[in-house]
A protein has these predicted regions:
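C-terminal helical subdomain
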Residues: 169, 177, 181-223
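N-terminal Rossmann NAD(P)H-binding glycine-rich loop of SDR-like oxidoreductase domains
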Residues: 15, 19, 23
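Active-site helix of classical SDR
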Residues: 111, 145-146
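Rossmann-fold cofactor-recognition segment
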Residues: 46-58
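Active-site loop of short-chain dehydrogenase/reductase
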Residues: 71-72, 118-130, 162-166
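A short, exposed helix-loop element centered on a Lys and neighboring polar residues
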Residues: 111-112, 154
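Conserved mid-core segment of classical short-chain dehydrogenase/reductases
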Residues: 82-97
């Protein structure tokens, strides 16, 4: 089973509420080093935490991070972008590009860049933070990018399994961070989510459904489209 004891962890989006919790909890679990990455990485007061500049939308930045962090055993694709409006037709072009590059292409190219590094280790892990919106298309391009990442995570899991790289996908509704500040639905505490994710990693699980919303939405994938989206059923009456 994968273990955080002695692990070298890289966290994207480490300046944010969820990323900061991943940094601290990885160390609590026994990680020997954590690369805390962001476009403008903050200063930490722990010598085990290494600030590292990384823009997940920039291929050159991704390659530079892989070159600088060749000892990584756990890659946590946590960085994400959201949108101000719900529909693909109302998003700005910049919102669409930012979401595609941050939520999908960034984790994808990070996994590709770090795959040789992780494959060379005895125990290694990739954690991809998805969303319950992976399975519920009301978030426009945000939902679309998270669905794409879910599919890519499933593919990478199969491709990397022979090399011993364990790939975990995480689905959750709202988390109490700045990104969800305007949401009025119940929110999960970041520390609780991180604890659940790291428990799942060390238990060898492949997928984390962190809340009831995620459980229900995944179960609904096999239902008729009209059951998931009642507004479509109304049009057929």
């Amino acid at each position: 089973m994968p273990s955080l004891t002695g692990a070298v962890v890289l966290v994207t989006g480490a300046n944010g509420g969820l990323g900061t919790n991943f940094v601290h909890h990885a160390l609590t679990r026994g990680a020997s080093k954590v690369y805390a990455t962001a476009r403008n990485p903050r200063i930490w007061d722990d010598e085990r935490i290494v600030p590292l500049t990384l823009d997940v939308t920039d291929p050159a930045s991704i390659q530079a991070a892989a070159a600088a962090a060749g000892d990584v055993t756990v890659l946590i694709n946590n960085a994400g972008a959201s949108v101000a409006s719900a529909g693909i037709l109302t998003h700005t072009a910049d919102e669409i590009r930012t979401n595609v590059e941050t939520n999908f292409l960034g984790p994808l190219f990070l996994a590709r860049a770090f795959a040789p590094i992780l494959s060379a280790k005895d125990e290694s892990v990739i954690i991809d933070i998805h969303s319950a919106m992976s399975w519920y298309a009301v978030g426009g391009i945000y939902s679309a990018t998270k669905a794409a990442l879910w599919s890519a995570t499933n593919s990478l899991r199969l491709e990397l399994a022979p090399a011993g790289v364990h790939v975990v996908g995480v689905h959750v509704g709202y988390v109490d961070t700045a990104m969800a500040a305007k949401a009025t639905d119940p929110k999960m505490e970041p520390a609780d989510l991180v604890h659940m994710v790291l428990d799942a990693v060390e238990a060898g699980e492949y997928e984390v459904l962190a809340d009831e919303t995620s459980v229900q939405l995944k179960a609904g994938l096999s239902a008729p489209i009209e059951a998931m989206y009642p507004q479509l059923a109304a049009k057929n009456v």
